[in-house]
Amino acid sequence: MKINFFIKLGFLILFTSKIIGQNNSNGLVSGNIQTIGQYYQEDTIINAALPEHLYGFNGFANINYQKGDFRAGIRYESYLNTLEGYPSTFSGTGIGYRYISWNSDNVGVTVGNFYDQFGSGMIFRAYEERQLGIDNSLDGIRIKYEPFKGFNLKGMIGKQRHRFEDGLINGNGIVRAIDGELNINELFDSTNYWKLKATLGGSFVSKFNTDNNTTLFNMPKNVGASSIRLNLRYKKLRFSGEYV
């Protein structure tokens, strides 16, 4: 039943994209579908445990809409049953990712789910690695602002994805983060011709969580982390450093 849904959805995406794509004034719809199925057989040589369901299925369908500076999208996910090796917290079928965003020349706003990373990702990284079953997207609000050329600010607040049970379920912790990055070469026109390229950045991330306390430890409810970073490039030489 779920496989038939994905097949019908695929034809709908292709058909809609073809029609709307001919008239850009109405916007553009795009999408893709990925399905992964596994059939398990008993291996008497290595005595591997055989799951009761015998067949695993993971399915993903993305639908995105874009018109000018506005974008929106959803991702429908299905785990019936979850592939072996995937986290046991992935089960059922439903919406696992949805967002709307608006971007102009120097301002960008995203509401819903999004992925992002500060610097090397040591203090904040929200990303998806589907083959490993990793998805810790942030569900909240993100604002990007470029007050002047070469200087970018980014602030966000939200909850991270924790598990999937017939839909997205976030963790209880609230993430609050801000990041700034200064491109020296873009800041001053005279430095655009320098062979040395330099970028400075700084980040601060805090998390509020009331679930940390146990009978053995009384953990703080607010935990913060900060970092500064420097990226240098000279011809084929590159240097990246971050202090946390």
Language-model segments: which ranges?
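Bacterial Sec-dependent N-terminal signal peptides
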Residues: 1-30
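Surface-exposed extracellular loop regions of Gram-negative outer-membrane beta-barrel proteins
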Residues: 115-126, 131
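Phosphate/ribose-recognition catalytic cores of enzymes acting on nucleotide-derived substrates
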Residues: 97
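Signature for the C-terminal beta-barrel architecture of outer-membrane proteins
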Residues: 23-56, 65-66, 71-72, 76-91, ...
